[in-house]
A protein has these predicted regions:
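Short catalytic-site patches enriched in acidic/histidine residues
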Residues: 67-78, 214-219, 229-234, 272-309
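A composition/biophysics-driven feature that prefers long, compositionally simple stretches
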Residues: 1-262
Length: 309
């Protein structure tokens, strides 16, 4: 039983099975994705955040999956700071971590996403950090992870992106998540590189940063909590003013919301004749939310009579 881990059934573990399960698959899609429209805007946000903390290593986790029941997880939503600064969208990538690595001498960032409106302007402030995106890329189909890991295995959750694909889409250097501990510890210490983490995003990463601080002789406890709060505050305030790309996204969300209400209105006749009419309306609106976005931002808030005034 112990060998099953979190799996509810026992998996075959012999070479014949491994040879069978790893063979006969069709080719994966070739080529690399185009650069994301969000990439240059995310680069500008990272540059703005880094300017507040020159010489410090900034750790921004996406967050972890949360179990709903058995081996089923809730739909994933990354931490807002990660999504905003990585520019990867609202479903990338459980357990990923964006690290803004301090440059020893501020200059042009090695990330290839251009900052909007300031390509080579010498008056533009030099970047203080290089972004590195750590995540778990897809494994080989000959690996045990491919068929044996219900959380990350391709057989269970579909094709995961490669490091090269995410680099192409984001313009951010990517690395395997297994290399994160060494990267956080590099040159850390008093009088050297300091660390800050968005502590609420991922408990495991926060614990890793705490351990790294302890080994490097950096402050922990309340002092570290205040340091981390400064990063969370700066990242949050950065989201207050929307850039042109975000404004376009808000307009698209408004249009999708209107379309959802249009579908809801068309469902009213069927809802009136159904014993759970409110669910008919919720379903109509929710379908549009899934088609045009990631889902509902809020559950239904409905009122009638004096409560609606």
């Amino acid at each position: 039983m112990a060998s099953r881990g979190s799996n509810r059934s026992r998996q075959p573990d012999n070479q014949a099975f491994r040879d069978f399960i790893s063979s006969g698959w069709g080719p994966r899609p070739g080529g690399l994705p185009a650069r994301s429209e969000a990439a240059p805007w995310a680069a500008a946000r990272r540059e703005a955040l880094g300017a507040h903390f020159p010489g410090e290593r900034l750790v921004l986790p996406a967050g972890a999956l949360k179990v709903r029941n058995n081996d089923c997880d809730y739909r994933f939503r990354p931490h807002s700071a990660f999504a905003h600064l990585a520019g990867t969208g609202a479903d990338f990538e459980p357990d990923a971590v964006l690290v803004l690595e301090p440059l020893t001498s501020p200059g042009r960032n090695t990330n290839t996403a251009q900052t909007p409106g300031a390509p080579d302007d010498p008056t533009h402030a030099a970047p203080t950090h290089e972004a590195v995106l750590y995540f778990r890329p897809r494994a080989s189909r000959s690996s045990r992870e491919f068929y044996g890991d219900p959380r990350y295995g391709e057989l269970w959750v579909g094709v995961r992106p490669s490091l090269e694909e995410v680099e192409a889409a984001t313009g951010v250097r990517c690395a395997h998540i297994d290399s994160l501990p060494d990267a956080l510890a590099k040159d850390a210490g008093p009088g050297a590189v300091q660390l800050r983490v968005v502590a609420e995003a991922d408990e495991a990463i926060t614990d890793l940063v705490t351990t790294t601080r302890q080994k490097a002789g950096l402050e922990t406890g309340q002092v570290a909590a205040e340091v981390d709060a400064g990063l969370a505050e700066a990242a949050s305030e950065l989201r207050l003013v929307k850039d042109p790309w975000e404004i376009d996204q808000l307009r698209a969300a408004v249009a999708a919301t209107k379309a959802g209400f249009d579908d809801l209105i068309r469902s009213i006749p069927r809802a009136r004749g159904h014993w759970r009419g409110e669910r008919v309306l919720e379903g109509a609106f929710g379908a549009k939310a899934r088609e045009e976005g990631n889902g509902l931002g809020y559950d239904t808030i409905a009122a009638a009579g004096n409560h609606a005034n």
